[in-house]
Amino acid sequence: MGHVDREDLLNVIRHELRLEDDDGPGLCSRLLLNPDRKCRAGGLPLDFRLKNGDLMDDGDAGFDDIYEIPLYEEPIHTRTLINDSLALRTAEKIKEEGRRDNFYTGPLDELFVKQEVNWPPKTPISTEKSAIERYLEENSANLNNPLGEYSKFAATTTDPSRQIEIIIPMSCDEEIGFKTLKIEVLTTARIREVIGYCLLQYYLTFDSYLPGEVDDYQFYLAEEDGEIEHELPPLDSSKLVGQVGFTCLGLVSRIKKNGNSRQKRAVAVWFVDKDQYVIEVDNMEKPLRWLRDEAFRLREETVKEREPLFQGLLDIKEYYMEAVDNFDVKLDLEASISSARSLEFVMIRKNSSRAGFHPRGGRYGRQMSAMLTLKMPNSPIAAGPMTPLPTVMEESPAVAGTSNGFGFPKAESCGAIASTPGVTWNDDGGQLSSFIVQRIHKFKPKWKANLIFRWTCFEIEKYREDRSAFLPQGYQKHTKVPWEYVGGVRTQLKDAKAGRVDMWQITFFWLPVLSDETVKDVIGDAEWNLNLVAKIYANEEKWRSVTLETFFKQDVDEIFSQTNSILQARDASIYKAFSHSSFGTLSPAASADLALMESAEAIVSPSSDAPSRSSNGKNGGKFRKMSSLMASVMGRRKSDSK
C-alpha cells in the first residue's frame, strides 16, 4: 500500500498542480505560501537560464516555468562564470559606444614649443649691493680674524654677563704705559676664553694685534691706575668668569714676564689596553679636552701602522679622563691640565671603568689609593683625595732646577683640593719601598742605612750588616718622621770631579713632631692651617734636615718622585709653608707668612653672587698692604741669605 507524506504532497501541489490552477480562481495561491519565500537561498545554479536557452526561440514562455530541479547538483565554480559574464558585458559596451584609440600620427616637432636660449646669460648691471655683500663687508674683521671664534662670548641682553676693565701694559718704547679696554662677557665663559675675547676686542679697537697666541697671556689682579699685582699668582684659566669677583684685571704676556719661551713638559696618556702616548705640552693652561684629542690623534696614527685591517672600523671616542693616581674621580675636560695636578692620565670609555688598572702594576692600584689618603691619630691634616704616585715626567735634566723643587710651579703647589672623610690607622702602616743609602753627619762618619717609605712616614735605620765599617757602629740614630711634618725634599749632584763616579745627595726637611699633649692643648679639635704653623713654630729658627747619598741616579729619581707625590697628595700646611722657604733658608714662621699671602686670593676675592659693580678701592688698599709686606719679607730673605 503506497504512502505519501506531507512534504511530498506539498511539493506536488507547488510544482505540478499549481500550473493547472493559474487560469482558475487561484485557489492554490490563496491556500499555499509563495514558494519563492520558502525556497533555500542559492538553491538554483547560476547558469540555469543558459542551459535551456535553446527553448527561448519557441515563444515568450518564461524560463522558470520549464526548469527542472535536478535530484543531485554538482558543485560549480563561479569564478569562470563571473569572468565570462564581465567579458561579455565589456565587449557589448565597447561595441555599443564604438570607441577607437586616439593616436597622434603627425610630425613630432609640432608637439614642442621652440624657444631661443642665450648662454651664458647676461647679468644685469646693478650698482646696488646685495644684503650678503653688505654683511660680509660689515663683518669682515670678525669673519677673517683668527680670533673670530671668541666673539660668541660677548654679552647679550638675555644672558647674565659681567663687565670687566682690562689693563694692558705696553712696551718701554711707547710713550703710553698701558692701555685700557672695557669688555662685557658672559658669566659662563672661562678665563682662557675671556683672554681670547680681549685680544679680539683689542684688534677691533686699536686696529693691531697683540703679539703671541691666546695661551701666551694670563690675567693678574690690577687696579684702575694701571698697577698690576705681579706678586700674586695669576688666575686659573679654567675658572668661570662668574666665579671671579674682580672688575679690573691685567693682561700680561707670560713670555715677556719670564723673559723666555714656555718650557715644554711631557704628559703621558694611558688607555686601559696599556697603550701609552707621550704628548709635549708647552702650556699647562690648555684644557684637558685638547689633551684628549691629541691622544686620539696619536692613537689613530698608531692603529693605521700597526693594524691596517681595522682602518675602516668606527672607533667610539666617548671617553673621560682620570688622573693615574686618583681612582673614580672624573676630570672636567674644560679644566686646565695644571688644575689636575698630575702629569699622567688614564682614558676610560664612557659607561665603563678601569677596574684596578695602573701603569706601574698592582701595588700602585686602588688599594694604595685608599691607604695613602688615611689620617693618622693626631695628624695635622685631614685626608686628601689625591694618591701619591712616583712620576718623573719633567724634561729638565736636573731635578733641582725647577722653581720650587717639586716638579711644578709655585702657583700650582698651593691650589686647594677638596677633603674626603678620613680613616684611622692604628699601626705604622705597611712598607711601600726601600733604598740603600749612605747617611751623612756633620761631625761623625757617614754610615750605611736603609731609607724606608711607609704609608704614614719615612724612616732611616741602620743597615742590617755592614762589614766594611772600621769604627764601631753604635752611634747610628734612628729617624722616623710622619709625612704630615715633612716639608719637602731636595736632590743635587755632589761636586763632580773628572774620573770619579757621580754622587747624588738627597736632603729631607721637616719640623719637630709634636707630642699628643701639645696637639691636644694647643690645637684641640681645630684643623691645622698656616696660622697655627706660624704660631707653634715661631721659635724655630730653621728647618730640620737630614742628608743621604747614593751613586744610583735611578734611585734618586724614584725617591724624589715618591716623596713629592705623597706630599702633594696630603697637601699639608707644613708642606705649603716649606714651598715658600727657598729650600729651608727662611724660618718656618716666615715661610708660613709667605704662604698665607700667596693664598690671599681665596680670602679677598668676593663671592660669585656679589654685584659686578663693586668698587676696587677697598681691595686696592689690601693689595698694597700685601705687596709692601711681601717686599719686606723678601728683603729679610736676602739679608738672611747674605
Swiss-Prot record:
The keyword Transport does not apply. One of its GO terms (biological process) is mesendoderm development. It holds the Pfam family CRIM. Keywords: Stress response. Residues 603-642 are annotated as: Disordered. The keyword Cell division does not apply. One of its GO terms (molecular function) is phosphatidylinositol-4,5-bisphosphate binding. Residues 605-615 have a biased composition (Low complexity). GO terms for cellular component: cytoplasm; plasma membrane; TORC2 complex. Residues 189-314 form the CRIM domain. Component of the target of rapamycin complex 2 (TORC2), which transduces signals from growth factors to pathways involved in proliferation, cytoskeletal organization and anabolic output. In response to growth factors, TORC2 phosphorylates and activates AGC protein kinase family members, such as Akt1. Within the TORC2 complex, sinh-1 acts as a substrate adapter which recognizes and binds AGC protein kinase family members for phosphorylation by mTor. Component of the target of rapamycin complex 2 (TORC2). Belongs to the SIN1 family. This is Stress-activated map kinase-interacting protein 1 homolog.
